[in-house]
Amino acid sequence: MGQIEWAMWANEQALASGLILITGGIVATAGRFTQWYFGAYSIVAGVLICLLEYPRGKRKKGSTMERCGQKYLTAVVKLFGPLTRNYYVRAVLHLLLSVPAGFLLATILGTVCLAIASVIYLLAAIRGEQWTPIEPKPKERPQVGGTIKQPPTNPPPRPPAEVRKKPSEAEEEAASAGGPQVNPIPVTDEVV
């Protein structure tokens, strides 16, 4: 049985946490809660988390489905090098970002989700995982002339090669001249 790649789960959890923090922050700020500034903080922290977590990391085995537009944010995340590649750093960062948002009821759900993502990232880091970007594969252009020796001469459906017969010269001349063709099946006018 295969080994679980925890970073993939942490990535999804953290991205959802960022969106939940943004939503809770909007509710707290727009609703003019008593401590609305924690809501404003949650919006900023949620946007930062979403920008960091949007690019998926490459899996060790199998293929990784790239998110729409991920390649643009991947270049930005790659610029920070070991700060974004190391999952210990991400675990601590997410845990620290989640603490201030925990003081407001509207953002407590995002706080709990982000703390869970932090624990999952810590588990991924202990298991030796790290973030690697999904690099685009170079496209191989197929050699058109290399696979087809000679194009087919008969229209489909074609009989198997051993059953096909070569047309005689008289038939070829009649076909090219546009003259009448002989029907090999006898036609009768009997009506039953």
UniProtKB/Swiss-Prot annotation:
- Which residues are exposed on the Cytoplasmic face of the membrane? 2-7, 54-69, 81-86, 127-192
Query: So which tissues is this one expressed in?
Result: Expressed to a relatively high level in kidney, spleen, thymus and lung, and to a lower level in aorta, adrenals, and heart. Expression is not detected in liver or brain.
Intramembrane residues: 70-80
Organism, by scientific name, is Rattus norvegicus (Rat)
Q: What is this protein called?
A: Cytochrome b-245 light chain
List the molecular function annotations (GO) for this entry.
Answer: electron transfer activity; heme binding; metal ion binding; protein heterodimerization activity; SH3 domain binding; superoxide-generating NAD(P)H oxidase activity
- Record function comment: Subunit of NADPH oxidase complexes that is required for the NADPH oxidase activity that generates, in various cell types, superoxide from molecular oxygen utilizing NADPH as an electron donor. Subunit of the phagocyte NADPH oxidase complex that mediates the transfer of electrons from cytosolic NADPH to O2 to produce the superoxide anion (O2(-)). In the activated complex, electrons are first transferred from NADPH to flavin adenine dinucleotide (FAD) and subsequently transferred via two heme molecules to molecular oxygen, producing superoxide through an outer-sphere reaction.
Q: Where in the cell is it found?
A: Cell membrane
Q: What is its main location?
A: membrane
PTM annotation (Phosphothreonine): residues: 147
The way this protein sits in the membrane is described as: Multi-pass membrane protein
Instruction: Give the transmembrane ranges.
Output: 8-30, 36-53, 87-104, 106-126
Matching InterPro entries: Cyt_b558_asu
Pfam families xref list: Cytochrom_B558a
Can you tell me which family this protein belongs to? Belongs to the p22phox family.
Superkingdom as given in the UniProt entry: Eukaryota
Extracellular side residue ranges read 31-35, 105
- Region: Disordered, residue numbers: 134-192
A GO biological process this protein is involved in?
cytochrome complex assembly
Specify the cross-link site (Glycyl lysine isopeptide (Lys-Gly) (interchain with G-Cter in ubiquitin)). 149
Q: Name one GO cellular component term.
A: focal adhesion
